[in-house]
Amino acid sequence: MIVRVHLTPPPRGTAGGPGFVGVAIDVLRATSTLTAASANGAARIVPFAETAEALRFRDATPGALACGERDGRIVEGFDLGNSPFEYAPEVVSGRTLAFASTNGSRAMLALERCDRVLLGAFVNASAVLSTLVLPESGGGASAAIEIVCAGSLGRFSYEDAAFAGWLCRALVAQGATLDGEGAKSALAHAPGGADEVRLRVERSQHGLMLASLG
């Protein structure tokens, strides 16, 4: 396995490509929220760069919901924001989610040419790892893995780098080779344990911003 990491999103469609499995990371909090949505039965997640695109898709697609945020707040006309608590089974089960967020959507769309794109966060860390390394999980012991961190407004974010680092460390333990400075830098940010994860998330710039919004 070869693993590459982008600590901030490259342009749309330029990360990975055919033959790659992509992992989009936005710990705070698109990929954490959408993990909850998937666990609660959401049928499909469609990322959009612009909120207007998500609204048009929602209006043209029976049963779809427009979801996400701008600058941490729900968008006017959207059905849901970007908190996992909004994505209860009775709300999202069987529904298609048109999702547009400030940072997370950019990470997902950067990977759109990959054969498959996973959403990664600490809340589903074990499931992501298993999908990447175990053939029976559907990942097929991925030969090429491209990881994109959402960052914050085009800047590095500690919480995303921490999860990317955790994933790199776990993949190296399974025989993977890190390719490029991004992957090596992410590995250097791998957290030491659960307490360090919590502190990194709470003290990150994005974590402090979300806390200020209540």
Segments from the language model and where they lie:
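Short, structured loop/turn "capping" segments at alpha-beta junctions
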Residues: G138-E146, Q174-E181
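Glycine-rich anion-binding loop/nest that anchors nucleotide
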Residues: E146-S152
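Long, charged alpha-helical interface segments
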Residues: D79-T96, A100-R106, A110-R116, S130, ...
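Short acidic, Gly/Ser-rich segments with clustered Asp/Glu that frequently serve as metal-coordination loops
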Residues: P10-T14, G22-L34
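Generic secondary-structure signature for well-ordered alpha-helical cores
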Residues: A39, A43, P47, D59-G63, ...
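Active-/binding-site microenvironments in catalytic and ligand-binding cores
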Residues: P18-F20, A36-R44, E50-E53, V201-L208
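N- or domain-start disorder-to-order transition segments that initiate the globular core
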Residues: M1-V3
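Acidic/Gly/His-enriched mid-domain segments of enzyme catalytic cores or analogous surface patches
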Residues: F48-E136, S142
